[in-house]
Regions:
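Glycine-rich phosphate-binding loop of nucleotide-binding enzymes
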Residues: 55-62, 70-72, 79-91, 188, ...
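Pre-P-loop entry segment of helicase/translocase ATPase cores
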Residues: 431-465
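Extended, folded cores of ATP/NTP-driven motor/assembly subunits in large transport
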Residues: 2-445
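Glycine-rich, charged/polar anion/phosphate-binding loops
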Residues: 147-149, 355, 446, 452-457, ...
């Protein structure tokens, strides 16, 4: 027994002596580790710098601009005609342009500011003000308390619309800068003609938006302040230091540390169009995510609706329409039409499109329609949100499908400028990009949402869950009669 112990000790000592005689490889190992590229989500974001003089963002391969627009409270034929003319004659050809409708639950700051003049007074003021604030914050986090017979997804949200566009960057090209500045003026004037006022988004606005979309917290109701670092690239400032992502077949899991230091996980799911909708109207587009007549057909979780479109070259589409028409016309005059009778209808459709393209009455547009939802990391919450999205849009004639195995791709497509960096071509190769005429695409734009009315006053949420305040003397409400107003609050 003693011999075995002595042999074991001897073997251990010999191993240590041999290890000490070997050359030290720690320095080489450290050099190897230092040369390795570890995966960072910020590395795939294109944002680099912002030029405040021109209002342009400098990205990896592109240069572009971004607007924040006020959502339309409604629409009519004249607004649709103005937007169709904008798509057909004002947008650059072959350039992806993205429209983003963001439904945010970060309404805590707006609630505090809006209720500052409607606060309780007296000895119990602090207590009752806290109860009122907690009531509305709880409604934004989950939903308003209703009787058991009324299980409606009524909550509080803030809707915002963003428009982004970028073109391939040319080195040391002053002409391109001037062209982009002119493009900004043209688009803002055209959107103003459709009663859509805009403002140019700067670097701080972009970073704040991206930090909200990339670093979600299902329990956070307040915007987290962030001070922009002028000496660091924008893409690194968009991602939280504690960011973590897990990619699965059915969803994305984004984790981060909350303000309390505890880890919070959000489940992100994407949906895109299975086929072109047969009929769509701009004035009913808001009913797809918050139906007024059927409130149960609403999306209660935070979401982002993204429509990325690219107006195709007019000459190429004219040639394509001519070739298609001649091909189906030839088939319609043979026995082929007896076995496939739809070829007659197809010939008529391509004939009409060819005529409208030849007279510049329309243009063909390639577009990608995507919805991204944010829910708590639970199967029940994810399934409930999925049914809300699919059922709400099915009511409006839209057939959506979950982006199984492609949630990361769709998540990246949701981000501004990402499609202009080459992702749109990947979407086309994947077969998820649809084609339609400018009139149909104008009716698909996600730009209709309820108005917040006034920044402060009597809190009166809308049926579409928009956080709104009523102040009859606020100039932004465009009131013309101030003779008498009667209002009341709880208590």
């Amino acid at each position: 027994m003693s011999n075995n112990i002595i042999d074991a000790v001897t073997q251990t000592v010999n191993s240590l002596v041999s290890a000490l005689k070997l050359p030290d490889e720690s320095a080489k190992a450290n050099d190897t580790l230092g040369s390795m590229n570890f995966p960072q989500f910020s590395r795939i974001l294109p944002y680099k710098d912002y030029d405040s003089a021109t209002g342009l963002f400098i990205n990896n391969k592109t240069i572009g601009f971004m607007f924040e627009a006020r959502p339309l409270p409604g629409a009519d034929k004249s607004i649709v005609a103005t937007l169709e003319h904008l798509l057909r004659s004002k947008l650059p050809r072959g350039v992806p342009v993205s429209f983003h409708l963001v439904s945010s639950k970060l309404v805590g700051n707006d609630i505090d500011y809006g209720l500052r003049e409607f606060r309780w007074s007296g000895k119990q003021a602090k207590k009752f003000n806290a109860i009122t604030q907690a009531y509305y914050l709880r409604a934004a986090e989950t939903k308003f308390p209703l009787p058991p017979a009324l299980d409606l997804p009524l909550t509080l949200r803030n809707y915002r619309v963003y428009i982004s566009c970028c073109v391939p960057r040319k080195k040391n090209s002053t002409t391109q800068i001037v062209e982009m500045e002119n493009q900004i003026k043209i688009l803002r004037a055209s959107l103003g003609g459709a009663y859509i006022p805009t403002r140019i988004l700067d670097a701080a606005g972009l970073v704040e938006l991206m930090r909200e979309l990339i670093n979600p917290d299902p329990h956070e109701m307040y915007r987290v302040p962030y001070k922009l670092d002028p000496y660091q690239d924008l893409n690194y400032q968009c991602v939280d230091d504690s960011f973590d992502m897990q990619v699965t077949a059915g969803h994305l899991k984004i984790g981060r540390l909350g303000r309390d230091g505890k880890e919070c996980v959000t489940r992100v799911t994407s949906y895109h169009l299975e086929s072109d909708p047969e009929m769509a109207f701009l004035w009913t587009s808001a009913d797809n995510y918050a139906n007024l007549l059927n409130p149960e057909l609403s999306i209660s979780c935070p979401f982002v609706i993204t429509l990325t479109l690219m107006v195709e070259d007019q000459v190429k589409t004219q040639n394509e329409a001519n070739m298609k028409f001649m091909d189906v016309e030839k088939k319609s005059k043979t026995s082929y039409a007896k076995f496939f009778p739809n070829v007659i209808k197809e010939m008529q459709e391509w004939g009409d499109i060819r005529q409208r393209l030849a007279t510049n009455q329309t243009s063909l547009v390639s577009y990608f329609f995507n919805i991204t939802t944010y829910t708590a990391d639970s199967t029940e919450a994810s399934l409930a949100a999925e049914q809300q999205v699919l059922n709400s849009y099915r009511k409006g004639g839209f057939q959506l499908i979950p982006a199984r195995y492609h949630h990361l791709r769709n998540f990246l497509a949701m981000m501004p400028f990402k499609c202009g960096e080459g992702l749109f071509k990947e979407l086309q190769a994947a077969g998820v990009v649809k084609r339609a005429e400018t009139f149909q695409v104008a009716n698909l734009l996600p730009i209709v949402a309820d108005s917040p009315l006034a920044p402060a006053g009597l809190l009166a949420p809308t049926y579409r869950n928009q956080l709104a305040f009523i102040d009859l003397f606020y100039e932004g409400m465009n009131n013309t009669n101030f003779n008498m107003a009667v209002c009341g609050t709880s208590g």
